[in-house]
């Protein structure tokens, strides 16, 4: 049996069962609340309890998504009654983003596995190890990680590693995106992402769906993924139809099995032969869903531009033909693949926008010339590409396969019957076994019972979900048992087998929240500066009232002037939000010359660096190192981190991205730049590239300026001039 789990999305109950039937070993699914896909057709708690019985009898698993940020009220009042019945029904794990939720679940449901969500932005094995003591047994690295980084994680930890191998890619690091909340007041961290990144934007360098990524497909890379030591291959797509998750589950299960059973040489032969079943299956999976074709994701793509497709959003389909002739009301095109009744085609303009949609009336073979009527006024021209966005025959085939799969549970049976002793019947399935006992076996008065008679009665499963594939019996000679007793024993054994599929775990009352001491930054307001001009302005403030946050990546090249300006004034160090192990060594000399008064914890890597190098000064959580509830703040305190102080002035960072806008638009020159992008509804953002670490930060166009004088505030300056900065400082009585 394979050690690699195929983990499928289940956006509905139908999708859950379909994925299991087509080869998924586990599914991840939300329920009524707290999942990252609030608008999926999530099953109810009762439906999930039934699904858990089905899953466990088929040796499958169900993971519940609780991967959003919760308020104190939700955490203390609503989460326990949601999870408790599923825990008792044997829920296999919860996928979690909020560290407060992590702490709560580990305390109240200690026997349940917890998986750290990709929303936690974990970039290494030692970062994941931070949460082992909170019950984490598995983590999902950020989708921006490369296969080399995944291999390194495997060497760093024995925690299970779950990696996205197929489906949509977010432009922003998961969990770090605030764009949906900013544009439409629908927070991705609350499960309501509206995907505004898929909308068209304009910029001075180019227009289009500037932040829209292709979908990922890694079928050809299965050998590298398996050899990297990944435990679970995760397919994205809880908002997609059941046919999507079911079909992709079958493909990834099949090709993992091919590699594991037949080896690398056989698999590479499939990859090299473009007419192999592997490539045909990849083309079919494009028919199911793709955006701009497929890419290999950040796991394998070396050029980030290959990950983007700015010309079109939504299902791209597959190119099926080219227009040969266009006339008023008609289009003539040659097809290169088979077309089926009820396929949906799109005639597209050169910019990939839809010119006309056509539903196929008659089947056509590759090479056939098809004539179709089109609406007058539609832009149809010779050489125009025709795409299929719905493959009706493929969808029907998947549905038929789901319907006809025999998912009865195979059992092995063994009966032991000795005169004077209770008859024992043992049933063994994939995941568990049971033994039940009946009445004592009698000595025969007339005709003895035969093994064949007993086996015939045991094998009759009727309308149950079981089949008996193997049966053995030890029967003492000259014995007798009524067939009714055999039937009763079989019913009791099947009932016991089904009961055993439920965990048998029990949970008492919710444990009261014993509040712990929190760490709070109380020293002063904080000014985060980004330019030397701003640093010169910041030192005009009173160091008793104001501390300066110094982003090391922005000031390393000005080391001598920085030291001269600060003159032993204590500073707060901050590292890039996305930072790999060892990167801090780039700034070692600057760090050693500074009077480090505190460190900003804006990532797990920053926490690990602080634990190693800055044990004797306070650590302050950035607002993006989420701690929305009291329990999350307590977890930070256990790490030694002060909770963030409230934001004052500053542009909001709505995205931090591995993708680079300048690279997408062929403007990559290695120079830091600020690019204004505008959305269709007047939304404006600035994109700023960080070439040293090759990522972008996207900011709101304007800063927040409302003064709050009752407490210290954290002010973020980006590219303000000295005069603009002084004006803000005076408004806040800091100058």
For the regions a language model picked out, list residue spans one by one.
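Active-site pocket-lining/capping segments in soluble small-molecule metabolic enzymes
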Residues: 1-122, 140-234, 239-735
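As written
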Residues: 135-136
